[in-house]
């Protein structure tokens, strides 16, 4: 049997969601038990020996990855959700999209001051959602000690944005272009 890399499990869909876009579909990675296991192990590898209090995942595919990572680390999991999806008391951060604005929220008691958080998502593009998630965590007094992604789209500048914030960024693979 050949050794497949995480990248080999990711399907590319042309012209989705708009013409000219190459959509990197990680659902094929999630559907394959071996590929999913490899991805979780590789997401955790750079953090061996580090202590985390919680893992935060960005909606929606970050929930799948973040939940699995939190399980492996024996930590809690914090969902960072889109506006209108969390009941109860929340804090929010807005961020700019190409055309407009979006909001992410987290429960106001999800993270305690001083907790060490690993932020996880499937894909790093412009970094806007990840930056908003980091700001939410910091607003609650948490410390983001790592940002882990399956896919980095370096041409869109997200890694540079997060590194400029002082974040350690780990991605399993990169795809050039849009």
UniProtKB/Swiss-Prot annotation:
Protein localization = Cytoplasm
Domain of life of the source:
Bacteria
Which protein, by its recorded name, is this?
Answer: Adenine phosphoribosyltransferase
Q: What is its EC number?
A: 2.4.2.7
One example of the protein's molecular function in GO is: adenine phosphoribosyltransferase activity
Alphabetic keyword roster = Cytoplasm, Glycosyltransferase, Purine salvage, Transferase
Q: Which InterPro entries match?
A: Ade_phspho_trans, PRibTrfase_dom, PRTase-like, UPRTase/APRTase
Q: Which organism does this sequence originate in?
A: Cereibacter sphaeroides (strain ATCC 17025 / ATH 2.4.3) (Rhodobacter sphaeroides)
Stored PROSITE patterns: PUR_PYR_PR_TRANSFER
**GO BP, one annotated term:** AMP salvage
Catalysis performed (reactions): AMP + diphosphate = 5-phospho-alpha-D-ribose 1-diphosphate + adenine
Question: Which principal EC class is assigned to this enzyme?
Answer: transferase
Q: Which family does it belong to?
A: Belongs to the purine/pyrimidine phosphoribosyltransferase family.
- What SUPFAM superfamilies would the database entry show? PRTase-like
Q: Which GO terms describe its cellular component?
A: cytoplasm
Q: What does this protein do?
A: Catalyzes a salvage reaction resulting in the formation of AMP, that is energically less costly than de novo synthesis.
Q: In which pathway does it act?
A: Purine metabolism; AMP biosynthesis via salvage pathway; AMP from adenine: step 1/1
Q: Tell me the subunit arrangement.
A: Homodimer.
């Amino acid at each position: 049997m050949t050794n497949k890399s995480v990248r080999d499990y990711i399907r590319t869909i042309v012209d989705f969601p708009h013409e000219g876009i190459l959509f990197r579909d990680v659902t094929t990675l999630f559907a394959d038990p071996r590929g999913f296991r490899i991805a979780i192990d590789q997401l955790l590898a750079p953090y061996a020996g580090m202590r985390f209090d919680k893992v935060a995942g960005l909606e929606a595919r970050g929930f799948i990855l973040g939940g699995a990572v939190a399980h492996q680390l024996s930590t809690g999991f914090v969902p960072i959700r889109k506006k209108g999806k969390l009941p109860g008391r929340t804090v929010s951060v807005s961020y700019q999209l190409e055309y407009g604005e979006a909001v992410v929220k987290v429960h106001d008691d999800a993270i305690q001051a001083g907790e060490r958080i690993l932020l996880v998502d499937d894909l790093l593009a412009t970094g806007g959602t990840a930056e908003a998630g980091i700001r939410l965590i910091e607003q609650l007094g948490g410390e983001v000690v790592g940002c882990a992604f399956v896919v980095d789209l370096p041409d869109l500048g997200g890694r540079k944005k997060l590194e400029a914030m002082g974040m350690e960024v780990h991605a399993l693979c990169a795809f050039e272009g849009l």
